[in-house]
Amino acid sequence: MLNQPAPEQISESALLRLEDVSRVFDISRGLFGDRRSLVAVDHVSLNLAKGASIGLVGESGCGKSTLGRLACGLLAPSQGQVLLEGRPLPPAGANSWAAGRIQMIFQDPFSSLNPRLSVGSAVAEPLAARGVSRAERRAQAEAMLATVGLGGMGDRYPHEFSGGQRQRIAVARALITRPDVVVCDEPVSALDASVQAQTLNLLREVQEQFGPAYLFISHDLAVVGFLCRHIMVMYLGQIVEEAPADALFAGAAHPYTQALMAAMPTGSRRGEPIAALEGELPSPLAPPAGCRFHPRCPKAKDICRREAPQWKELGAGWRVRCWEA
């Protein structure tokens, strides 16, 4: 029997709520092969308050990008529901009450920008569905480009900008509708360290100015810890630990979280180094029995191989799925 979300994860005052959300993909093997089910997201709940920032961290293939797409309506859940201010979230692109209220920033800004549109037109495009006049769209786009440090460049095209500048354009486009929520899917992973820092500072500044809530997705705990006060750790479709950022960095409880911390640059973490993660992520088509992390866990015992751990509460807003925590 699945544990219910803790009160601090689900509340009536949540801006964006994911309630026991799962997403299953049917995978066929060859032209006449059997169809198999891939559970990309497995019974995940979260509560994102107005103006808050939640970090979602895990290795590539753990399901975090799928969860991000569920959160903004690009995918529909196979089970559970996504609510915005208590109302079911309609599909992205629908001409509805929720249009423009949740936006997404992708990992590759170049592929998310139309090369045939000037960046001013690309930034202004989301306003067209709201009936904003062309002149007003242009004025708002120029103002938003100035906000992200690209004032006076609206007539240029994406290929004329560096990777960091293109990500600034993507930030401007995401903010043009004054969204309540911005889902940031690995927005700095393709950038070098100095440009990463500039982009993260920009995201913090625009949050202070415009107040959107962030669901920030990354494989890098150091990046997530810079921007987010609450962190959720995902492994093979499940959340295995979540905690306030300070508590997590002071003493992560799950061996997987500890291994992610060990992969951080030395200056980014506190305390003693922890054994690095070994082995490959198992296939989500055939997840291990019991605790899904047990094949890679240095602390695994027999019960870990037999039974899936339930949530264990460790403090306010802090819980973990681990028999040894």
Please tell me what each predicted stretch does.
Residues 2, 7-14, 28-32, 37, ...:
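Short catalytic/signature loops enriched in Gly
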Residues 72:
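Helix-to-loop junction immediately C-terminal to a conserved catalytic motif
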Residues 157-161, 165:
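Conserved ABC ATPase signature
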Residues 176-180:
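A short, proline-enriched helix->beta-strand linker immediately N-terminal to the Walker B motif
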